[in-house]
């Protein structure tokens, strides 16, 4: 039987750093206001790179680290809510740019759960026995979706990308999974478009900017998501580390208490990146492999958990 494993990781973020103090010069906010409520100190903002550019950078890194040629890839999956265009997909742009001529490619839109949903999908593709190698990338340029006068939302987000190479393995590496959606509670809205045609009344006004009910998302995370994670941990055993979506430091603090796990097991980097939606978990994973907290090819187990707009939430327990 075929199994799947994460064999390489990589991440990339734009060079432009925007601090809380920088934001205080263009909107009514302060470093103390942002940091005390979110833990975020700075974020990366793209100046001219689009989502596919960030994702392509990660794809090239993964190929270089693995020594694979792009022709050896069977698929490219990209999780994003900020694509370059409605079509082609970001994944298709990446596939074409890197020359993965034998790979199929598509995007997954599940907001901050997107990378977990994409990784779970890719694991099933390899486990089917039909495919052997593929890239799973989370990439966002959320700065282009924000109303920069809306301090409640604009201060939270940043741009970046991260991803993994998933390959066939003789051993099981994915030990637990829980994927969920509640479409009756949106919570996050981005790029709402009016319904306009020659036959519509034309009265609906579009709002192109991302909007978020932060309190509702916080309550959802610490109640519903923590319960889901706790159930998975009780069933499959406690992992070595928890890599949760990087939305808010207070969510991590509360989650640890709710799940009854040491806070030290919850890795964090939103201080430097802000909320990068689908990119947050793979960036966190890649950074902690780079600093040797996590070691690929070891027996370490990690729990990856995303939660956000949709509402969506999902967790995987993976041996890396």
Swiss-Prot record:
Ranges for the region named ACP-binding are: 246-250
Gene3D superfamilies given in the database record: 3.40.47.10
Its Enzyme Commission number(s) read 2.3.1.180
Instruction: Extract the InterPro entries matched here.
Output: ACP_syn_III_C (IPR013747), ACP_syn_III_N (IPR013751), FabH (IPR004655), Thiolase-like (IPR016039)
- Give the active-site positions: 112, 245, 275
This protein's pathway reads: Lipid metabolism; fatty acid biosynthesis
The main location class comes to cytoplasm
Q: Which UniProt keywords apply?
A: Acyltransferase, Cytoplasm, Fatty acid biosynthesis, Fatty acid metabolism, Lipid biosynthesis, Lipid metabolism, Multifunctional enzyme, Transferase
> Which is one GO molecular function term here?
3-oxoacyl-[acyl-carrier-protein] synthase activity
What does UniProt give as GO cellular component? cytoplasm
Cellular compartment(s): Cytoplasm
Keyword Cytoplasm, does the record have it? yes
**In the UniProt record, does the keyword Acyltransferase occur?**
yes
Against Pfam families, the record matches this protein to:
ACP_syn_III (PF08545), ACP_syn_III_C (PF08541)
Enzyme type, top EC level: transferase
Q: Which GO terms describe its biological process?
A: fatty acid biosynthetic process
Similarity-based family = Belongs to the thiolase-like superfamily. FabH family.
Its domain comment says:
The last Arg residue of the ACP-binding site is essential for the weak association between ACP/AcpP and FabH.
Which PANTHER family does the entry mention?
3-OXOACYL-[ACYL-CARRIER-PROTEIN] SYNTHASE, BETA-KETOACYL-[ACYL-CARRIER-PROTEIN] SYNTHASE III, CHLOROPLASTIC
Q: How does it assemble?
A: Homodimer.
Concerning NCBIfam families, the annotation shows: fabH, PRK09352.1
Q: What does this protein do?
A: Catalyzes the condensation reaction of fatty acid synthesis by the addition to an acyl acceptor of two carbons from malonyl-ACP. Catalyzes the first condensation reaction which initiates fatty acid synthesis and may therefore play a role in governing the total rate of fatty acid production. Possesses both acetoacetyl-ACP synthase and acetyl transacylase activities. Its substrate specificity determines the biosynthesis of branched-chain and/or straight-chain of fatty acids.
What protein name applies here? Beta-ketoacyl-[acyl-carrier-protein] synthase III
* Gene name of the encoded protein: fabH
């Amino acid at each position: 039987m075929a199994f799947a494993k994460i064999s390489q990781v990589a991440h990339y973020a734009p060079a432009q750093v925007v601090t809380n103090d920088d934001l205080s010069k263009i909107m009514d906010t302060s470093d103390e206001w942002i940091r005390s409520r979110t833990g975020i100190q700075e974020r990366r903002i793209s100046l001219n790179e689009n989502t596919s550019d960030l994702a392509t950078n990660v794809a090239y890194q993964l190929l270089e680290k693995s020594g694979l040629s792009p022709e050896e890839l069977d698929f490219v999956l990209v999780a994003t809510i900020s694509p370059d265009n409605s079509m082609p997909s970001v994944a298709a742009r990446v596939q074409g740019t890197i020359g993965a001529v034998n790979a199929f490619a598509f995007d997954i839109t599940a907001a901050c759960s997107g990378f977990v949903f994409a990784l779970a999908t890719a694991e099933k593709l390899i486990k089917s026995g039909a495919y052997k190698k593929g890239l799973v990338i989370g990439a966002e340029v959320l700065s282009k979706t924000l109303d920069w006068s809306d301090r409640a939302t604009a201060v939270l987000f940043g741009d970046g990308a991260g991803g993994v190479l998933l390959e066939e393995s003789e051993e099981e590496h994915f030990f637990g999974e829980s994927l969920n959606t509640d479409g009756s509670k949106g919570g996050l809205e981005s790029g709402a478009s009016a319904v306009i045609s020659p036959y519509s009344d034309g009265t609906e006004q579009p709002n192109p900017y991302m909007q978020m009910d932060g309190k509702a998302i916080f309550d959802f995370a610490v109640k519903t998501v923590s319960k889901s994670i706790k159930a998975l941990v009780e069933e499959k055993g406690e992992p070595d580390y928890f890599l949760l979506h990087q939305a808010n430091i207070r969510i991590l603090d509360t989650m640890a208490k709710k799940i009854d796990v040491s806070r030290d097991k919850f890795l964090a980097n939103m201080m430097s990146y802000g909320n990068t939606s689908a990119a947050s978990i793979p960036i966190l994973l890649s950074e902690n492999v780079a600093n040797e907290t996590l070691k690929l090819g070891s027996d370490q187990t990690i729990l990856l958990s995303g939660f956000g707009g949709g509402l969506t939430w999902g967790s995987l327990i993976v041996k890396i």
